């Protein structure tokens, strides 16, 4: 009996050793896979700056949390904004021109911008934070729909006027006001014909994804 008990104890110890060994190997493999995945993700995130004819890349905006966009800065004050799934926008400084040979899928935004058509309501607070509400002339929300006091005040004073909601903009008013940029929310994707119409009129459309 003692011999049998000893044999059972030896078998149990061996099984325990095998189990621990198996788990150690499994954990090691998981760690290796995790490191490889993280490395691959880092490589994917390290995007190569776009080569723009006539411009020299300088640096990129450092982002701590945002993942939906990136900003690359070039010489002479040019900046390329990339918004995931929405496209790229080249911001051209006042007095400068868009470089020749620019890719057709890059939208040009010419500074200064003083007559923005803001449809994405969530972006208004960002404009307030940078003291930029004065650059918004056209609103996609009526005065009583704004929760931001500065926007209400601007509409009450006439500095900002209602130009129709995202799916029914007042094209004539927007054109008369010399709109240089329309900032839309993702709701515009339900009415792609509106975005196409604005672009046909030469108005850049940027879809905000915050």
Task: Indicate where each model-derived feature is located.
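N-terminal secretory signal peptides that target proteins for export/translocation
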Residues: 1-14
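N-terminal hydrophobic or amphipathic helices and topogenic motifs
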Residues: 6, 19, 33-112
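N-terminal Sec-pathway targeting helices
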Residues: 12-22
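Generic detector of N-terminal low-structure segments
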Residues: 21-24, 30
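Cleavable N-terminal signal peptides
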Residues: 27-28, 38
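A short, structured surface patch at a secondary-structure boundary
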Residues: 77-83, 87-175, 181-188
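Residue-level detector of structured alpha->beta connecting loops
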Residues: 178-179, 202
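Charged, glycine-enriched surface loops/patches
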Residues: 191-210
């Amino acid at each position: 009996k003692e011999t049998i008990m000893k044999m059972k104890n030896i078998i149990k110890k061996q099984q325990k050793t095998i189990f621990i060994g198996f788990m150690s190997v499994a954990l090691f493999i998981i760690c290796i896979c995790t490191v490889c995945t993280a490395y691959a993700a880092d490589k994917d995130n390290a995007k190569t700056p776009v080569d723009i004819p006539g411009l020299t890349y300088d640096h990129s905006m450092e982002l701590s949390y945002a993942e939906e966009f990136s900003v690359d800065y070039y010489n002479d004050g040019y900046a390329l904004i990339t918004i995931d799934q929405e496209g790229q926008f080249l911001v051209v400084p006042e007095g400068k021109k868009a470089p020749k040979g620019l890719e057709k899928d890059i939208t040009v935004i010419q500074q200064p911008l003083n007559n923005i058509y803001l449809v994405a309501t969530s972006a208004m607070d960002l404009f307030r934070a940078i003291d930029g509400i004065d650059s918004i002339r056209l609103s996609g929300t009526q005065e009583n729909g704004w929760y931001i006091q500065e926007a209400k005040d601007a509409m009450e004073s006439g500095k900002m006027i209602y130009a129709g909601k995202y799916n029914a903009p007042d094209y004539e008013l927007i054109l008369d006001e010399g709109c240089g940029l329309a900032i839309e929310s993702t709701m515009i994707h339900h009415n792609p014909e509106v975005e196409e119409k604005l672009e046909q009129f030469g108005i850049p459309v940027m879809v905000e994804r915050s």
